[in-house]
């Protein structure tokens, strides 16, 4: 499946111009991530893995520690390469089993017309800082006691929902289920605001090699369609993409290439019909209703 993901990434500009096929591919990949990588292979990464790695660098690195579980070792190797090339977005959006579970549940909720709540951007900007605070607290605790840090890392519902298939005592199950219930009404609340693993993977994102998500000069002003549609609110009102919060779902890229949906392209298409190629003035950009 690594080859499939690389194909998606390298040919994303072609795939996003076929929205129906792209959505089927994405949903199919998420099902694979949840059922095979997560529930079957138990390949759910955890902040505990990151803390163990950092502590091993401090106390004396030993390969044997990380070769005990080959699946986790291979997955971490793949994720490390992906983070260096594309940032954390690809892991969070495509390879995290709990993230896949949340997204699939939210997709089903939307199909059933469950009302969705959008967190005001001013609040969103402040709430996503919580996961970095959790990361710092866990890191500080791990320097004193790795065992204590591992217990505190139960802020992650991964062990309950993925590794143990919800077969735990009721407090852990209640916590995991509560996060999934909230996710029915607003997508990936845990990922956006509480996940210390996502925070840890976001730190090296600024060093990524590739920057393949396209934007237009009209993005943010006057057009704000993509930031209104972005389910994880990774696109700021000024139009730029915050890669430290992006999950690389490629929805904004499907809009970018769609001349029946992207307002600047709509204006350009109408201009061609009138016999000229000018993209039109910003004030001509049509208003698009966002549901």
PLM feature spans:
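Non-ligating segments of multi-cofactor redox enzymes
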Residues: 1-237, 244, 251-291
């Amino acid at each position: 499946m690594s080859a499939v993901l690389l194909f998606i990434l390298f040919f994303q500009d072609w795939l996003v111009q076929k929205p129906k096929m792209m959505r089927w591919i994405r949903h199919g990949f998420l099902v694979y991530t949840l059922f095979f990588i997560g529930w079957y292979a138990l390949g759910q990464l955890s902040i505990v893995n990151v803390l163990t790695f950092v502590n091993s660098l401090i106390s004396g690195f030993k390969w044997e520690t990380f070769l005990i579980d080959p699946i986790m070792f291979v997955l971490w190797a793949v994720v490390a390469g992906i983070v260096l090339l594309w940032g954390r977005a690809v892991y969070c959006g495509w390879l995290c089993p709990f993230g896949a579970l949340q997204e699939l549940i939210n997709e089903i909720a939307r199909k059933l017309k469950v009302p969705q709540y959008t967190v005001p951007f001013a609040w969103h900007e402040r709430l996503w800082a919580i996961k970095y605070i959790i990361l710092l607290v866990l890191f500080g605790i791990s320097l004193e006691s790795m065992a204590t840090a591992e217990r505190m890392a139960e802020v992650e519902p991964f062990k309950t929902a993925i590794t143990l298939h919800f077969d735990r005592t009721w407090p852990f199950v209640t916590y995991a289920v509560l996060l999934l219930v909230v996710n029915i009404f607003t997508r990936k609340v845990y990922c956006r605001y509480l996940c210390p693993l996502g925070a840890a993977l976001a730190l090296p994102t600024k060093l990524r090699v590739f920057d393949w998500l396209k934007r237009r000069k009209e993005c943010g002003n006057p057009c704000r369609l993509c930031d209104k549609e972005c389910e994880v609110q990774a696109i700021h009102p000024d139009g730029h993409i915050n890669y430290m919060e992006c999950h690389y779902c490629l929805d904004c890229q499907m809009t970018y290439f769609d001349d029946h949906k992207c307002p600047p392209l709509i204006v350009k298409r109408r201009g061609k019909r009138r016999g000229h190629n000018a993209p039109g003035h910003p004030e001509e950009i049509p208003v698009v209703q966002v549901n």
